[in-house]
Amino acid sequence: QAHQYSKGIVPKVGALPMKNRFEPPVAACVAVKKALPSVPHYLQAHYWWAYVHPRAVHVFERQWLVNLILWGNYKRLCNAVLQAYGNHLPGRTLQIACAYGDLTPRLAACVAPGGALEIIDILPIQLENLAGKLAAAAPIKLHCMDSAALTFADASFDRALLFFLLHEQPQAVRERTLAEAFRVVRPGGTLTIVDYAPPSRFNPLRYFWTPVLDRLEPFARDLFSEEIAAWLPKDRNFSRVDEQRFFGGMYQMLTLKVAEARPIGKPASR
C-alpha cells in the first residue's frame, strides 16, 4: 500500500475501500480539492453497479472481463491507442476518466523522460483502484475532478485521451466534456477518442447488443446512432488526423488535432 500513500489515496480499511475521502495530498503527487466534486446524479442512478459501489472494482477489475465486455477487442483497441502515440508520450498527457484493465499502466510505460501522465476521475474509489495498478515510481498524477468542469489551465496538455467515456454520459455532459478536453489541449496537440460507433448494418451485434446497452447503459445508444462530430464544440477549430473503425464498425478511434481558436464567422475545418 506504500505507493497508494505516496499518491494521497486512502488505503483500504477492512474489506471495503473508502469511497469518498482522500488523505491530504503529498506535494507534486495528487492535486485534490479540499471539497471533492459531487458525484453526478446520472452516474449514481445508472452506473452505481459498475463504478460507484464499493464492490464494483472487485467485480470489474479483471482483464478477461473487460475484454469480454468489448467482445474480445480490449487489447486491440489499447494497442491502437499506443500505436497512434508511437508508444512515446513526451510532455503532458491527460487521460480523462479511469479505465478498468491495463490501459493506464501501458500508457505510463510510454511516458518520455520529463513527461507526465495525468488522470482525472470524479470517483475517489476509481482513483484508488488505479493507484493500485501503477508502480510507485510511475510518472503519473491523479486528480479528483469532473470531466465536464476541468480545473486545468487552457492549453496545458500536449494530448488528451477519452477512452470509452462519452457513451456513459448524457448529451449535455458529453458536450461539456468534449469542450473541456479541447480547451485544455494546446494548439497543435491532439485529442484521441475511443468509443462505440454506429455499427455496419451487416454486424449482427447492431441488433442484439443495442437492446442490452439500452438497459444497462442508457446513453450509449447515442453513439450507435450518431457520429461523434454531432457533439464536438462549434467554437473550436480542429482537423481529423486519423479515424479507424473496428469490429464491423462497432468501435472507433478518432484522433483530432487542435488548432488556434477560429475568428468569429470563420468556418471550422472538419
Each model region followed by its residue ranges:
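A short glycine-rich, Lys/Arg-flanked "PGG" loop and its adjoining helix->strand segment in the class I
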Residues: 175-187
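Class I SAM-dependent methyltransferase SAM/SAH-binding core
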Residues: 92-149
